[in-house]
Structures are given as C-alpha cells and as structure tokens.
Amino acid sequence: VPFFAIFNMEVSHESQVWKRANEPLVIHPDSIIPPPYHPDDETTRRDWAVAYSNIHEMDKQVQQFIDEVDEAGLLDETIIIWYSDNGGPMPRQKRELYESGTLVPFMVRFPDGKLAGMVDNDLHMFVDIPATILSLANILPPDYMHGIPFLGKFKGESRNYVYGARDRLDEIVERQTCVRDGRFRYVRNYLPEKSGYMEILSRLNMPMMQNMVRLFKRGKLNKETSRWFEKPPKIEELYDVNNDPHEMKNLIDNPAYSKEVERLRGEMEAWNKCYNPYLGLTEAELREKLWPGGEQPIVEPPVCVKTGTNKIQVKSNT
C-alpha cells in the first residue's frame, strides 16, 4: 500500500539552542569560527557549539526513521526527502531574507541509488516541493499549484529567479521582499524606519542574542555586526552572493550594477503584483479583506467519495 508520511524534528529548532544548552557537546566551542555578522566571543561560540550538537542529534533521529523503514522492508521502495524549513537558527539567520535565512539544505534518497552524489545548483522555492512530490509519484500537479517540479515525470524548466517575503513574524510586523537570481540578491525595505533586528521575546532567551543586544547598546559591536541593529541605510539592497556570501556589502549605489538593480527591481515588482497584492495593507485593512465586516467567509465543504473497501477520497477546491 503506498504511503506518504511527514516527520518534523524539533531538536535543531532555534529554541533548542537555549533549551539544550546543558546537553553534552560534540564540538568544542574554541573550534567555532562565527560568521562576520556575529561577535567572535565565548558566548557566541558556545551557542554555535550547541546548535551544531543539536544537528548531530537530529542526524541520529533521522537514522532512526530510516531504520524503521528498513525494518519494515520498505527501504528499497521508498523515496526519502530531508530538508529544513528555514536557514540557520541563529540571530540574523532565521526570519531574514538574506542567504543565511533562505538557503536551506535539501536531500533526496532514491531506492535504486538514482542520482546518488548529484548536486543540483538550480534555483528552487518551497512552493516547488509539493509539485515535485506529486511528480515523483507520476501525478501531474494541478493547475492551482504555483510550484515547478524539479524531479520526477513532470519535471519543469529551471527557475531564473526565486522570491521571498517577510511581514508578520511572531509578535512583530515587518515588510520586506527579495528576489535572487544565480548571483545577485535584491532586497526591498518597505518600513525603513525599522532595523533588521526584531525584538522577538522568545529569541531573547538565547544567551548569544542577549549578549549581542547588550554589546550593541554599549557600542561594543564592530561595524559589520552592529549594522543589523541599525535602521537600514537604504530602502533597497543589492548583494553579489557569489563574491559576498554573507551579504555584508550593499552594492545598491554602485553604478557598475545599475542594470542588475533595474532588472531585479522589475522582477520584484512583477512578483508582488501577481502574488503579494496585500503587501501595503495595515492590519485592520487586511483583516477586513479576509473577514469582510468581521464575518468569517464560508468556504465550499469537502467532498468524500468511497473508492473501495475501507477507502475514501476527500476532495476540496479550497
């Protein structure tokens, strides 16, 4: 009987950096080299060591799932997909539209060793994953899916661009969008009065986050690290990701890249017009759009069809 199962592992989640702070480490903090947007101190290296140790524990949990599939005699018939839901769990990673927050690991294991060792350098988005899973099952993705399959029978054309947005995160209202091609990332800040850093209460449990805030208030952070806490100096940002992987140098005013700015700005505006029409709405305006007059819209109920003994099919247009 075909099966589809999803397992979510929390051990490598942001919150586990402080919740598992006293667990044994598999890497010594002194061996950690923090990225340039983090202060290189004992607190930072310690939290990074916890994060890496959490990933090690997650790897062991993944192995347990694989062993269960093997013991059930299904390993040679099962496609295993593993990926994360955002970039790194550390400050200036999760929730950010930079590479540190949007680049995620993604691995596929086919039962016959197909494509083993292959590295796919094409651009993909999360919306591509459901369509890809259907394609792997030889099912044509429905028209209402925006995703492009990148594996399987219905594999589509490679993307030239990928897009991102952040607006309502935890208890914070923000408004940013981005577009990335094979080399450059363009970011638009719609609330330039806000800094990149957001005071998210749960994240302030992380010792490293507490330390960064304290150092910034004392003027002890270097230019690269403190930039995250300051108001964006520009409404627009452009980064050469290939040559500046941590996206520390904003090229938006460099005339040598004016054509890239114009091209990516146009792509961003076209994407917003098509997929992000409520971008500029206030909370009250958005609520009225979703629930006119404060009334919850009634959606079409699902349809259940009996397809065989002990089998039903549930369909819904919404």
Locations of the language-model features?
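Beta-strand elements within well-structured catalytic alpha/beta cores of enzymes
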Residues: 4-8, 58, 62, 69, ...
